[in-house]
Regions:
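Secondary-structure boundary elements
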Residues: 1-60, 68, 135, 145-161
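Hydrophobic/aromatic-rich core segments of domains that either
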Residues: 17, 32, 64-147
């Protein structure tokens, strides 16, 4: 899901070359470039949408932004991973959707988060559920069904400050 193709590489070329001494500057510029080039549009992609497909479509959701960021960071030899979880919405306790963001490993700092969809770095409102190489490794819920029976999965999440 995070292999860079021509469209992801085109985004990478628009960001100034990473300074080995200041990778955070590059990563913030990369995050902003992805947000500018790939419009957030709910419902336009799925869990199997690749970074390249989202970049080619020019639209996606948080997981697509994270996949593109991860592909680009890795192309610059910066370790990056996918994070799935929840973002506490200030106007409600009950959360209606999962959220995704990316993290890059910076020497001396460790894993640094980038929420490309919202244009910010994660803060205490973010609840991490899983990390992995991509969505498939960090999906909040996975499973398999055999047979033709109907089913419904319901998940209720409440996130509140203590």
């Amino acid at each position: 899901l995070t292999k860079p193709g021509p469209k992801v590489r085109a985004i990478i070329r628009e960001v100034p070359e990473p300074n080995k001494d200041e990778p955070l500057e590059y990563l913030h510029a990369l995050s902003a470039m992805i947000r500018d080039r790939v419009e957030y549009q709910s419902g336009c992609s799925g869990g199997d949408t690749t970074a390249e497909e989202a970049a080619a479509n020019g639209k996606g959701v948080c997981q697509d932004h994270a996949h593109i960021f991860i592909a680009a960071a890795r192309a610059a030899d910066i370790p990056a991973r996918y994070v799935s979880g929840y973002l506490m919405m200030n106007d409600r306790v009950e959360q209606v959707a999962t959220h995704a963001w990316a993290e890059a490993h910076i020497d001396g700092l460790g894993w640094v988060g980038f929420d490309i969809a919202n244009g910010i770095s994660p803060d205490p409102r973010y609840v991490r559920v899983a990390t992995g190489l991509d969505y498939l490794q960090a999906a909040p819920v996975t499973g398999m069904r055999i047979g033709g029976a109907d089913e419904t999965l319901r998940v209720d999440i409440e996130v509140a400050q203590q």
